[in-house]
UniProtKB/Swiss-Prot annotation:
Protein name from the UniProt record: DENN domain-containing protein 2A
Domain dDENN: 865-960
Entry's Gene Ontology molecular function annotations: guanyl-nucleotide exchange factor activity
Phosphoserine PTM positions: S544
Signal peptide from the UniProt entry: none
Domain cDENN: start-end pairs: 730-863
One GO biological process term: protein transport
Biased amino acid composition, Pro residues: 249-258, 288-307
Amino acid sequence: MLEARVDMLSSNMIISGPAADLGAKEASRPWKKQLNSVPNSGPSARARAQPQPLSIKDKISKWEGKKEPPASDPARQTDGQEDHLPSCKVERRGSELTRTKNGMRLETERLQNDSRARTVCQDTEQLPGPRPIDGQPELSQHRGRELKPSDLRFQSDHLSVLRQVKRLEKALKDGSAGLDPQMPGTCYSPHCLPDKTEEDLPSLESHEKGGVLAAGRRAHHLEVREPGPEISEDWKGQESVYRGSRWYPPKPFINPVPKPRRTFKHAGEGDKDVSPGISFKKEKRNLPPLPSLPPPPPPLPSSPPPTSVNRRLWTGRQRPSADHRKSYEFEDLLQSSSENSRVDWYAQTKLGLTRTLSEENVYEDILDPPMKENPYEDVELHGRCLGKKCVLTFPASPTSSIPDTSTKQSLSKSAFFRQNSERRNLKLLDTRKLSRDGAGSPLRTSPPSTPSSPDDTFFNLGDLQNGRKKKKIPRLVLRINAIYEARRGKKRVKRLSQSTESNSGKVTDENSESDSDTEEKLKAHSQRLVNVKSRLKQAPRYSSLDRDLIEYQERQLFEYFVVVSLHKKQAGAAYVPELTQQFPLKLEKSFKFMREAEDQLKAIPQFCFPDAKDWAPVQEFTSETFSFVLTGEDGSRRFGYCRRLLPGGKGKRLPEVYCIVSRLGCFSLFSKILDEVEKRRGISPALVQPLMRSVMEAPFPALGKTIIVKNFLPGSGTEVIELCRPLDSRLEHVDFESLFSSLSVRHLVSVFASLLLERRVIFIADKLSTLSKCCHAMVALIYPFSWQHTYIPVLPPAMIDIVCSPTPFLIGLLSSSLPLLRELPLEEVLVVDLINDRFLRQMEDEDSILPRKLQVALEHILEQRNDLACDQDGGPLDCVHGPESSSLSEVVSEAFVRFFVEIVGHYPLFLTSGEERSLQREAFRKAVSSKSLRRFLEVFMETQTFRGFIQERELRRQDAKGLFEVRAQEYLETLPSGEHSGVNKFLKGLGNKMKFLHKK
């Protein structure tokens, strides 16, 4: 009898698996379920089993030896069945029988131990046998065990299934089955079960509605088959039932379940595959059960499930069968509802399966519910952040309130759908980077269509700061910005006050400017405009210094290095500077460069020792650093960086100057090179030339980049020198202290205004270092602009005739040359005495060049420079700078940068995009609300300084941003929408204005 049973098992269940014989599958289902459940049913089941003398290995060997399916089942090999289930097939390789369905393979292998074999043998004897089919012997012996009522009910159901098998075989022979198209959800079912035809469903329903028998069978499976705790421990390390070949029980689920074996059944499948272990995992997690579901309408949860439980396995175990999620949507609800209530399993499974088959895009409904345009509109983004971790509240959480309305589409969704959409929202938020204060910053999310709460203003595009990650602006910059805003008022207000006195008690014209233009102001403005335009015609069109460096990118860091010493040509005569060393010895350049270089080499000694006649041998001398600038015939500029020091030896001796000539204007970089030169010169003069050779062979550094120079130093080995080029073209480490100690704030601002209008300025000082530092500091103040004209920080007395040039210049003279200067016929020039802080000669309008409000704000910041330079919390002037403190150079630099931001910071808005970028000049000027500022721009825009600045921005293809660009961007972000950089009514009608300007 057992042989016959094994034969039937192999022919119906295994070999006919690829075919679309539903009856064969259903007939084999009780055998597989019993084989799966008995080994784990507990000690009581094992105690009832009695040992059998028959060896199961022989039966299995005989069963696996079959090569072809029995001839008694011709219907199972028809072509109709092969077309009906193309994804199911049978493979025989040696002793291995494999069945593949949708990427899942259930392999039948040899049993490896005798205990498992005996258990399977005992279980086989307990199973009731169906009626014989096609001459198969009847299995009626049960080895001394009486049939229980549940077994009788099980057998009666099995008989009804066999009748359906015969009906299906008959239909297959007639060719009326197996050719129907599959519904979308069928191919994703776990065990590749075919769908029931419409004519089969009523008959199956009649068999399932057996009344007492069906209810008793459900009660038996729900109550009796509950594994003990020791068996549940054995299940923890087992593989998923979808992957392995052995019939392990499904993994215990969590709430929500991590996708164990399916719990719904196809119509007519019966209640024979209720998966064991439905309720014991619930007790381990101590989680509240999911709500029960009413049968016919789509499942509606009575209360939302807790969102704190994610559907993923957080214990680190892999989720089983992640590739077959599409047909599992309704398993969770059905399985969880079975724990709390005895529902009609057939009605629930039919309902879930019908919904699965009726929706073509079930998975899209889960991930992308169409009820929300913005997935963040229900997410609370503020008030929930702790440190750098954000605690987000979702609509389904117990703390959130959901209106109890049946019209909401979100409530019509099942709990699984809502949980998946919430989990997707959480995943989207997790992928966003958190800002420094811990708040999420979804940069590219679309704003809500109808903002109705203060939270929705996070997506308001009018405020540019809200939609992006907040930048940390230094406190010093914030304080400087506040001073400017307090002085000039708001952008749309043209007057600070209509009264004669302001809030501070000062006269109105001190802090604000009246719009009434007097004849004197108009006349002065017209005269300045004429002078600037006339100088623009006379002066050569110099390009900006940054553009000069473009063709120099592939050259060396410097052009040549020289040493200048003082010598006497004859006794009793004055000392004369002479060139004593030169590197490289030969200038391998073009003829034009060599001719120009020779002229410069002749002039360099005069710049290194402009005070040569005043020198005498000294015993001690502190080294000093200064620089000069050589301007070529074509306007090209070369910088000379000098270090004057006393050579080694004893007794009185004369100093010498080490000079580096380069086209790169970076004082800090070459100052570091000169430090290394001085260190090696103290050891031996022979060590200087190898160092300069290494520096010349180094690549030319790009903006903001660092190059490394290696050089051998006796006693220390190979030293590594890092040379960094600043990101901005302005001079770094400028000594503003010398400038402020020599000039008052009012005089300094007047000189600054004269340089902006490209006037001629001469500095007078008695020390070479003071003269050089003040000239460099003044040039650094006009950043981001570059001084385009003649610039000689220290002018030798032999070249004093240059001050008679009609072109703009900034020249420094030693006080010893002042008598010669008075004898020369000077034109309009500003002569500044740095020794006594006074103007020796001026044009009388220097104080009225700049816009009044901005000038007052600038002077106010410069007056409080020491307070701003100290710690922001306050402290003495000699306080130790902390992490929040700023140096004097930072305060001064930020003050003048903010001044230019107020004037021209809106230029990016008027740069046309395209291959040839150009500035819309008239629109740029008229966009300013202040009339005085517009008048200043009218003159300033005609200078070569402004033209070079705009040409550099027009030609710049890369987005390299210096300090000015960063501050200008921050300034534009603070403006309300529709008012960029002082843009008032003009930008609102920019289109009409541009048409008018085009016609003009």
